[in-house]
């Protein structure tokens, strides 16, 4: 009887593995489409947006990629079936970003001088790989991954744009972050945390959740402001992911 049970279970297991593989392949394809779409959109901004954005056009183009690519989280959450293939895909994008950055191609696509280096866009997928690994080893859940990725994408991206568009003082001589940018970071991160906890984590919307989200948002803004050497694309997502254990 045991042999019959094992034989019956084998096709079911094979079918489940095949379904997982199909989800992972679709996830990889959608990941490439997403990245190429936002790179193409940023290129359009570079070529056609100077009249609208002026000298800020390269920065806007860079943030189009920064914000847009963060939506990859939804592919990871709803399409991918395992953690290994998202990490493989992110590893590929890390190497591709690094190569384009070293050659200056990435800067040209962003409308900048070819000698400019955008290591932040290289750090971005590395930080997501680390966050996924931390989740894989039980140090957080899917909602925490969403908070980390989307707060970095939307929070940091919009904070940078608002910080440059709105004249306000710097937080201090030790940072380039402004009050306007940091307030934007706090507001956007707070919204992201609430949405992720409610819709991904299944938590009820309460005053306690709002308070915890506000504390996480302030913490994220402080990490961003105090991170040296432009490494906030690494520090912010990882810090948010880890602190979400207490939310």
Question: Residues of each region from the PLM?
Answer:
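Interhelical loop and helix-boundary elements at the membrane-water interface
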Residues: 3, 11-37, 43-87, 95-246
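Luminal/periplasmic acceptor-recognition loop/helix of membrane-associated glycosyltransferases
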Residues: 6
């Amino acid at each position: 009887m045991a042999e019959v049970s094992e034989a019956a279970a084998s096709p079911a297991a094979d079918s489940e593995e095949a379904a997982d593989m199909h989800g992972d392949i679709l996830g990889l394809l959608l990941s490439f489409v997403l990245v190429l779409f936002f790179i193409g959109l940023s290129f359009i901004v570079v070529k056609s947006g100077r009249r609208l954005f002026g000298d800020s056009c390269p920065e806007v183009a860079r943030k189009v990629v920064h914000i847009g690519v963060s939506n990859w989280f939804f592919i990871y959450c709803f399409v991918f079936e395992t953690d290994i293939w998202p990490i493989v895909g992110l590893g590929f994008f890390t190497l591709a970003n690094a190569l384009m950055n070293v050659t200056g191609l990435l800067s040209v696509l962003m409308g900048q001088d070819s000698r400019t280096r955008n290591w932040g866009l290289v750090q971005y997928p590395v930080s997501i790989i680390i966050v996924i690994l931390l989740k894989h080893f039980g140090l957080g859940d899917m909602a925490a991954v969403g908070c980390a990725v989307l707060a970095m994408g939307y929070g940091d991206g919009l904070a940078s744009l608002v910080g440059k568009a709105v004249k306000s003082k710097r937080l201090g001589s030790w940072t380039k972050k402004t009050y306007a940018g940091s307030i934007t970071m706090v507001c956007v991160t707070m919204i992201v945390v609430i949405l992720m906890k409610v819709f991904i984590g299944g938590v009820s919307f309460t005053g306690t959740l709002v308070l915890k989200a506000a504390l996480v948002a302030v913490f994220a803004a402080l990490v961003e402001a105090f991170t040296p050497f432009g490494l906030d694309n690494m520090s912010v997502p990882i810090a948010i992911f880890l602190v979400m254990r207490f939310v």
